[in-house]
Regions:
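Small-residue-biased structural context
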Residues: 1-153
């Protein structure tokens, strides 16, 4: 494992803080999905949409920072080139996950376009993919710098 002096305490604190924010957004979406929908589908949909919008914003911030020219991904490619394929995978996931969130938000914006059950299924799959993405990101940090960035709790 490499150590990279450019991954300093300040960087790690920021990464951990953003991970915690993303985790909170994931939990908010899960909470919105778990709320009762029968007889109050409009309010339920608004709550799910608001939580998903917040998650999308937090995820896009994560992508912007991770993929910045001086971000974790660029530093990983420089310091641990053996992990470049993992970085590439994470960046492909960024594109796929952002597009999926956009599609779900578009669907939620159209009244009657779907059912609460279908939304629950689709968004739950999204949450699972995001959780796995976070796990891969955590593994990458550990493999590159022997740093445990934690789960965000």
């Amino acid at each position: 494992m490499d150590t990279d002096p450019s991954v300093e305490l300040e960087d790690l604190q920021g990464i951990r803080r953003r991970r915690a924010e993303l985790r909170e957004s994931l939990l908010a979406v899960e909470g919105a999905l778990a709320a009762p929908a029968p007889g109050r589908v409009e309010q339920w949909t608004e709550r799910v949409c608001a939580a998903l919008m917040e998650l999308s914003a937090d995820f896009r911030e994560h992508v912007t920072i991770a993929e910045a020219p001086d971000g974790v991904h660029a530093r990983t490619r420089r310091s641990a080139p053996r992990l470049a394929r993992t970085v590439d995978l994470l960046e492909r996931e960024h594109v796929e996950l952002a597009a999926l969130m956009d599609r779900l938000l578009d669907l939620l914006a159209r009244p009657g376009a779907t059912t609460s059950e279908q939304v629950r299924d689709d968004v739950t799959r999204l949450l699972g993919r995001l959780v796995r993405h976070r796990q891969r990101g955590s593994d990458l940090m550990y493999e590159a710098w022997a740093v445990d960035i934690g789960g965000g709790d």
